[in-house]
């Protein structure tokens, strides 16, 4: 479960970094 949540958190984080 922890691995799934990480991922989910990294997905939006990477999207925001790409926008910046």
Swiss-Prot record:
Its main location: secreted. It comes from the Eukaryota. Keywords: Aspartyl protease, Glycoprotein, Hydrolase, Protease, Secreted. It is found in: Secreted. Its EC number is 3.4.23.-. Transmembrane segments: none annotated. The keyword Protease applies. One of its GO terms (molecular function) is aspartic-type endopeptidase activity. Disulfide bonds: none annotated. Glycosylated. The keyword Phosphoprotein does not apply. One of its GO terms (biological process) is proteolysis. One of its GO terms (cellular component) is extracellular region. Belongs to the peptidase A1 family. This is Pregnancy-associated glycoprotein 57. It comes from Ovis aries (Sheep).
